[in-house]
């Protein structure tokens, strides 16, 4: 999973993204260096921390070899809605919880 180009493109620091994604510092570092393969939820946590677009988030999910967001899936539809509106990780988790769906983190 190569997120370095996106970090540079968006002018973000890896340490800040890891913190905003609510990831363990070591695990987050290992994801960014490619030493660890993140779960779908971890990729989504990073996507929200980096404020990725839907296209960028799906590209990251594909690179991580997990399923892309599917608007026909209720949970994914809520996540897509939140991505489109630039919501924070906290906000998407609140929305998922409100609808009785599994949170991202």
PLM-predicted stretches and their roles:
Residues 1-14, 90-105:
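A short, Lys/Arg-rich alpha-helix, primarily the initiator
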Residues 7, 18, 47:
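The alpha-helix within a helix-turn-helix
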Residues 15, 19-21:
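Short, contiguous, well-structured surface segments enriched in hydrophobic/aromatic residues
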Residues 15, 26, 55:
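Key DNA-contact positions within bacterial/archaeal DNA-binding proteins
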Residues 21-38, 63-65:
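Recognition helix of helix-turn-helix/homeodomain-like DNA-binding domains
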Residues 35-48:
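Short, basic-rich loop-to-helix N-cap that marks the start of a DNA-contacting helix
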Residues 58-87:
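Short, charged recognition helix plus adjacent turn
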């Amino acid at each position: 999973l190569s997120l370095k180009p996106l970090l540079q493109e968006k002018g973000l620091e890896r340490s800040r993204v890891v913190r905003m994604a609510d990831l363990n510092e070591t695990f987050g570092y290992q994801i960014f260096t490619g030493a660890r393969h993140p779960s779908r939820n971890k990729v989504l946590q990073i996507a929200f921390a980096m404020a990725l677009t839907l296209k960028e988030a799906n590209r990251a999910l594909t690179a991580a070899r997990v399923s892309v967001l599917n608007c026909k899936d209720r949970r994914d539809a809520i996540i897509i809605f939140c991505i489109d509106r630039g919501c924070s990780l906290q906000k998407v988790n609140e929305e998922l919880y409100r609808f009785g769906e599994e949170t991202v983190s």
